[in-house]
């Protein structure tokens, strides 16, 4: 989904996506932008959420309502650390998460903690691997044949 993300305004962005979804044709997978609720920002301490925060509550509702897999990322806080965390929210209410492994050296590494584990999950017969932005610059990470995925998002 293409959208103009409103700088550091979680509620406004959730409302904006809700409006865009009204005109979206039926879809198996809806892919939202990186940090779609805040835009890319280093204001993690004031904008971070847990995996059960307003972003994931809302996305889970959308997944069920539209019977689609929703994928995107948000600023997550866990154990006093901040992550650029990707999610996949399933129509049945399940959720899986991936923390961005390769942080951009323009300051992202000073705020966020890098993830350490890839994520491959199954949806509608497809094995799907999640990556976030700068991860794509590290093809050996993504070409790992042991991951056995069909689709990279």
Locate predicted features:
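Short beta-strand segments enriched in small/hydrophobic residues
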Residues: 1-4
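Cys-nucleophile CN-hydrolase/nitrilase-fold catalytic domain and related Cys-dependent amidase chemistry
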Residues: 10-11, 19-91
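Short secondary-structure boundary/capping elements
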Residues: 12, 51-54, 111-113, 137
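Short, acidic/polar
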Residues: 12-22, 136-143
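Active-site catalytic loop in hydrolytic enzyme cores
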Residues: 77-147
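Short, intrinsically disordered, charge-balanced linker/junction segments flanking boundaries
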Residues: 147-153
């Amino acid at each position: 989904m293409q959208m103009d993300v409103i700088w550091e305004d979680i509620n406004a962005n959730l409302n904006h996506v809700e409006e865009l979804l009204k005109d979206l044709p039926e879809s198996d997978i809806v892919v939202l932008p990186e940090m779609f609720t805040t835009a890319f920002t280093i204001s993690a301490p004031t904008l971070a959420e847990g995996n059960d925060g307003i972003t994931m509550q809302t996305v889970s509702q959308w997944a069920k309502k539209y019977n689609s897999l929703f994928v995107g990322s948000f600023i997550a806080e866990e154990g006093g650390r901040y992550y650029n965390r990707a999610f996949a929210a399933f129509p049945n209410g399940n959720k899986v998460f991936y923390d961005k492994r390769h942080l951009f050296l323009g300051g992202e590494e000073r705020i966020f903690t890098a993830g350490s584990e890839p994520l491959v999950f199954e949806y509608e017969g497809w094995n799907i691997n999640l990556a976030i932005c700068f991860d794509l610059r590290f093809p050996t990470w993504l070409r790992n044949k042991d991951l056995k995925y069909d689709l990279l998002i």
